[in-house]
């Protein structure tokens, strides 16, 4: 029997945060209204930045939830669309174990009607990104993803839906930060000599704004009654001039904008467009914390658009739920073996405030992951390694005290990047640290902030950043002024001490190929460096191997992850302090 939910009973089962704003939308033209009769009310359910979070204890929302909610609304006679604003196939082991295939299957079964690609849709490579487009039963849109060989868009810029005579257009937009927050090499030819794909942005945002405005104008030409942005841009100031607010302020024609990328909980905020017209901007946060619900109500003379965020829902589609549970079980079986015990918590966030810290300052988990790379080469591969680096954006989850499994490490390092070892100059190391520290002290996060093993350094935040970068934030040249990063020291095991970096000397530098070889986060200073060994081991396996090297096993027979039990504790004078949430003091921010 079909289950109908009244508004009263729905509000009992769904936690709803009322929108902070509603906007009036311009009435459809006389020609659009005449002969069609009254335009219908339209409901748009939306998600963003789910990042493969399908195994929740809390919050409780899942793809099964949103599938059931959509069906419930449809059974009530509502006209419903379900859309996603990007970053859905990557984030946990439930995405990376099959390159997002099961996530796309879940979205297909849940009844998604449309999506736009986020930067993490490219994390498994360009070939996989394009295969995802074929596996999805729903279309993708992006007005600014360009094939430079043909000059054409890879995807349609808009999708127009005819909802009982009302035409709703969605304009897809992908963040230009994709180049550096995914892997720039994926956008290049096989020899990595030139870019063959582009995500239009521009230093001043002009290329992005132009692409968006052209898409809006196309939607108008096709007779759209309502034009909705479906963008993966975000509102973080560090993303300027490519934020959703920047785009709205430099274009005209949007009625509302569904956003993603910055993981911001924004039920609804009005932003003035270039003509001063208010546009409703909304974002659900991340990880299925909320489902967005936008209602287009043409009842009044001008009509209104309102938004709510739904934080809980009791319904679950049985088919979608079964697919998710089977996959969770499979992954847990593959990765569930316990390998160690954490006697304390390892953090990517500030232990006191809960605010994410890993992209701007040292933490004990940042130290641990970097140490894992360092120890892997020195102890397992038995290859001399002077220094290891790990980008903060590649460290994704706090780890509570208790049992560690392969799955734990996969949750922390879900990208599938591979460790490598290179011979570089001290000058290249200095350039990398300077580039990584360019936002330090500003309050802006940087996925390329470098955690280190076998090294210490200072960041002098009062000194302005003068590193040269291109419009895609890829490194172009050394700092032209006084460097912010100073007193870089490299650990010397024979001396049992840290000694000053020699710019002219060659060092063995370890890290992930994402950073050292594939221009990830824009690290181009290592181009042409001598490769000692590549494709050594996947990121989470490097971390797992390090955990299993610890001592301290007691009655449980498992290594205990304390500073004293680390194999690096045998290195005289090596800085270790996993008991301190803020790390061992390798990075000093002044």
Regions picked out by a protein language model, each given a short descriptive name:
Residues 7, 11, 15, 33-314, ...:
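Acidic, metal/ion-coordinating pockets
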Residues 22-35, 68, 493-496:
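A short, compositionally biased domain-edge/stem linker segment
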Residues 3, 38-43, 47, 52-59, ...:
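Catalytic centers of hydrolytic enzymes
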Residues 1-3, 9-31:
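N-terminal export signals
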């Amino acid at each position: 029997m079909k289950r109908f939910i009244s508004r009263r009973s729905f509000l009992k089962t769904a936690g709803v945060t009322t929108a902070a704003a509603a906007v009036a939308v311009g009435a459809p033209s006389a020609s659009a209204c005449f002969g069609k009769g009254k335009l219908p009310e339209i409901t748009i359910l939306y998600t963003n930045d789910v990042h493969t979070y399908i195994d929740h204890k809390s919050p409780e929302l899942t793809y099964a939830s949103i599938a059931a909610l959509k069906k419930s609304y449809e059974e009530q006679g509502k006209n419903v669309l379900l859309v996603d604003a990007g970053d859905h196939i990557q984030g946990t082991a439930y995405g990376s174990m099959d390159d997002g295939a099961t996530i796309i299957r879940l979205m297909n079964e849940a009844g998604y009607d449309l999506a736009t690609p986020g930067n993490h849709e490219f994390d498994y490579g360009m070939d996989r990104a394009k295969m995802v487009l074929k596996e999805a039963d729903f279309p993708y849109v992006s007005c600014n993803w360009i094939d430079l060989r043909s000059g054409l868009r890879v995807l349609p810029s808009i999708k127009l839906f005819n909802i009982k005579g009302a035409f709703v257009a969605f304009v897809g937009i992908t963040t230009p930060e994709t180049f550096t927050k995914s892997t720039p090499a994926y956008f290049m030819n096989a020899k990595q000599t030139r870019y063959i794909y582009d995500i239009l942005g521009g230093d001043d945002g002009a290329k992005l704004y132009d692409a968006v405005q052209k898409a809006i104008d196309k939607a108008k030409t096709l007779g759209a009654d309502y034009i909705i942005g479906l963008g993966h841009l975000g509102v973080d100031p560090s993303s300027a001039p490519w934020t959703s607010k920047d785009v709205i302020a430099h274009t005209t024609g949007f009625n509302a904008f569904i956003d993603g990328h910055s993981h911001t909980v924004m039920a609804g905020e009005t932003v003035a467009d270039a003509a001063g017209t208010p546009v409703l901007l909304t974002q659900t946060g991340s990880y299925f914390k909320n489902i967005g619900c936008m209602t287009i109500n043409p009842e009044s003379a001008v009509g209104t658009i309102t938004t709510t965020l739904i934080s809980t829902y009791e319904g679950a589609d049985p088919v979608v739920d079964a697919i998710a549970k089977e996959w969770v079980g499979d992954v847990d079986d593959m990765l569930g073996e316990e390998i160690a015990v954490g006697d304390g918590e390892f953090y990517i966030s500030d232990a006191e405030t809960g605010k994410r810290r890993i992209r701007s300052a040292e933490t004990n988990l940042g130290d641990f992951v970097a140490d894992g790379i360092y120890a892997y080469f020195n102890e397992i591969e038995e290859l001399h390694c002077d220094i290891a680096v790990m980008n903060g954006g590649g460290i994704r989850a706090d780890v509570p005290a208790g049992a560690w499994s392969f799955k734990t490490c996969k949750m922390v390092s879900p990208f599938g990047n591979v460790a490598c070892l290179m011979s570089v100059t001290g000058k290249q190391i200095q350039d990398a640290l300077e580039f990584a520290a360019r936002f330090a002290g500003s309050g802006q996060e940087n996925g390329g902030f470098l955690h280190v093993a076998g090294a210490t350094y200072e960041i002098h935040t009062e000194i302005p950043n003068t590193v040269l970068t291109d419009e895609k934030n890829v490194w172009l040249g050394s700092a032209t002024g006084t460097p912010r990063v100073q007193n870089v020291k490299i650990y010397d095991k024979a001396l049992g001490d840290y000694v000053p970096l020699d710019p002219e000397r060659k060092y063995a530098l370890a890290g992930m190929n994402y950073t050292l070889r594939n221009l990830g986060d824009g690290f181009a200073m290592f181009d042409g460096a001598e490769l000692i060994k590549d494709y050594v081991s996947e990121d989470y396996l490097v971390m797992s191997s390090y955990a299993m090297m610890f001592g301290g096993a007691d009655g449980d027979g498992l290594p205990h992850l304390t500073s004293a039990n680390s194999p690096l504790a045998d290195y005289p004078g090596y800085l270790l302090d996993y008991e301190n949430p803020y790390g061992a003091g390798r990075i000093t921010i002044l």
